[in-house]
Amino acid sequence: MPIDTQALFDEKDYTGTYPYVADGVIGPYTPANRDHPAYSAPAPGVRYTSSAYKVSNLRPYLGYYYACQNYMILASEPAVLRMDNIREEMFFPTIQDLYEEGKGWVITPASKILTMNLLEGQPRLIDETLKIVEWNVRFDILPEVQVYRKDTNQVYPITDFDTRGLIRDGAIHGTLRTQFTNEWRPVQFIPENSLS
């Protein structure tokens, strides 16, 4: 059944920074340093309710994706996330490899590494029947973020670990796409360098 486009869209302009929410706290947060990775990083909580097909409900859905990306860079613990495709979607898979192998981790002064900016006032409905929507976004990266490698005992800028070629001008640019239904559907990030 096609989506009711009048119900989906509203008159608001959602362009701008989306608030970062990660309040799933299991203990006092301890930032990483050369001696250890971050402890008790705040995890994102699900804020999505699928009761109605409205942009106001879509935004928290995409916000959860954003928070999961940030959490994976900060803590690399996918088990606490309700996002099945996070491993395929990770912006920095080589950092995940360092975490898993115990060879390194991210060092940052803050628990928020990414800032998501919505670049359009409203999403675009690209398939009315399948309810597929897209929204152009930019993820700004905190410039102070570094990656510590135990094997070299050195820190490196996070940009050195951009094996997917996503970063341009200190940010990751692209499009978030999802099928917006009353069930939890994966969000897919489409990098600007793969858009035609």
Each predicted region: which residue ranges?
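Exposed beta-sheet edge and beta->alpha loop/turn motif
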Residues: M1-A22, Q122-S196
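Long, compositionally biased
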Residues: K112-P123
